[in-house]
Amino acid sequence: MNPEEQQDIVRAVVSDYFDKYADKYLPLYPKLTEKEHIINIGTSILCTKWKVGYPGGSFAKAVVDNNLSESFGRADEINVHCIRFYLMLMYNVGAPTSLVQ
């Protein structure tokens, strides 16, 4: 499986998690218009954690490394409000079996 296919699988997982839990873990959810940005970053975080697809940038790496100060320091104006969502995503979602085959 190539990296693009791996990322598509992860993106579907993140999108599903967003649809189910965004209103619970994103305090500003009713005002958020950046769903795609959040799904892209969530995908980057899980790809980095699971070592599939393409590795994420410095923010994704900081979240995966559990580095709170660096996570906030590298977060953009959207992600600063999404860190709890990303942490819950990272710790509550397991890698799909289709990625480990």
What are these regions (language model features)?
Residues 21-74:
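Amphipathic alpha-helical interaction modules
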Residues 1-16, 32-37, 55, 59, ...:
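Alpha-helix boundary/N-cap detector
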Residues 72-101:
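Amphipathic alpha-helical binding modules
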